[in-house]
Amino acid sequence: MLVTLEGLDGSGKTTVWERLRSDDAVPSETVFTREPTDTWYGDAVQRSIDNDDADSLAELFLYTADHAAHLSETVRPALNEGRLVVSDRYSDSRYAYQGATLAGSGTFDDPLSYVREVHAPWTRPPDRTVYLDLDPETAARRSGATNKFETAEYLTTVRDNYERLIEADPERFVRVDATADPDTVYERVRAAILD
């Protein structure tokens, strides 16, 4: 089973992911992973994040290459072994974030749909996605707005994209209010994964 943690920067995904890694109730053979990865593909993605002038289409394909390698090297092998995979960010992040970035380019009528179409023939959709829901202003404040992906204006478009994804596949998504206290958020995410 592939479970993904999604949400705006500052929503608490990584904090929850770290807590799950040390939770004795989570099966010991669980594979914990994340995107961008720690590979050279992920390093290229990180360089693009840090570059305010990165071309949005080129950036999409860096993320896509990282995702393809992640699937072939980590996700699919673990799933083939029958293991639970929990990923801190996955394809929905790319759809939401790169869809928002491409929206600013004026090149695409529906950037979110374009990004999904690029992935449709080969990606492995999650079985369940836990979406940590947070308003863009709080997300920008929590994340420190240190790069181009963390401003409230940009995160508003990202959140709108996540809402479109949830509307298109409501059975897969579990929405968790990320404004709740951290222990409550964790327990809700944990229940969504283990129940």
Swiss-Prot record:
The protein's UniProt keywords, in alphabetical order, are:
ATP-binding, Kinase, Nucleotide biosynthesis, Nucleotide-binding, Transferase
Q: Which reaction does it catalyse?
A: dTMP + ATP = dTDP + ADP
Question: Pfam families this protein is in?
Answer: Thymidylate_kin
> Which Gene3D superfamilies did the record assign?
P-loop containing nucleotide triphosphate hydrolases
Q: Which GO terms describe its biological process?
A: dTDP biosynthetic process; dTTP biosynthetic process; dUDP biosynthetic process
Q: What molecular function terms (GO) are annotated for this protein? A: ATP binding; dTMP kinase activity
Family of this protein: Belongs to the thymidylate kinase family.
Q: What is this protein called?
A: Probable thymidylate kinase
**Which organism encodes this protein?**
Haloarcula marismortui (strain ATCC 43049 / DSM 3752 / JCM 8966 / VKM B-1809)
> Gene encoding it?
tmk
